[in-house]
Amino acid sequence: MWVFFINFAKNLEDSKFHDIILGKWSEHMKKNKTNISKLLLTLAIALFLGIATYFNIDLEGLLNSSNAYNKINYTASFDLTTIPKFENEPYVVLNDNKPDFNEEDFARDTFEDYSPLDYLGRCGPAFAKVGIETMPTEERGAINSVKPSGWQTVKYDIVEGKYLYNRCHLIGYQLTAENANEKNLITGTRYMNVQGMLPFENMVAEYVRTTKNHVLYRVTPIFENDNLVASGVEIEAQSVENKGEGICFNVYVYNVQPGIDINYKNGESTLN
């Protein structure tokens, strides 16, 4: 960073640059305080942009990171406080099981949209029009290089497979062939992954393979405040060609593991 300021100081020694800056400053000093404030703000912005450019800072990412969901123009249509407390069922139905897609979604050609990670490194919604053409043609590869927000490697004997957390695909690999995509992987319990999400993924995959039709499929991770681990995910799906006669659901899947208490702030856990 010092190199940048040294170069900036050297530029000030250049007579033309020096005269311009001093001239502008002198001119504005003669005006009222509002104009002086505007000049200071302009100089501050220029300096900030210069530093950002010099150090290759992703300004767009910083500006958009507080709400990555806007990238695919969707936020969950419910308040987390309205979701019933987990009662040994992996999911609850939302909005009378009706997804919240619009006509533009149905009209789009086959697509896959993944939100950029937000300023905490968290995933946003993942949205796709699933069809035979989006499904994998090879076995899934390794995904252990991805460390989703809140990731903890911890084992419990009461968990099938021992590991509490899985790297959960928002849109399952069998639907869109996305492997180690950090924008499509969250920290999820084994229970949510296998008991909660997988049955819905299998339902959609079987429908697409059997009918060769398409399905709109969107998964939205629900984070409370600045928690790094999602409280759950909203899964919406609707068959395209018959407007939901084949597949139609909207559910909230709990990111829980029976017998274990989870700190959603950072992913830490204890036996309850």
Which residues does each predicted region cover?
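Folded, non-transmembrane soluble domains that reside on the lumenal/extracytoplasmic side of membranes
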Residues: 3-6, 267-268
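Short, positively charged and aromatic/hydrophobic N-terminal segments
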Residues: 7-10, 14-16, 20
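N-terminal Sec-pathway targeting helices
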Residues: 30-42
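Hydrophobic membrane-insertion alpha-helices, especially the h-region
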Residues: 40-54
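Hydrophobic single-pass membrane-insertion segments
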Residues: 53-64, 235-238
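N-terminal, intrinsically disordered, polar/charged segments of Gram-positive cell-envelope systems
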Residues: 59-110
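Domain-level detector of nuclease and nuclease-like folds
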Residues: 103-272
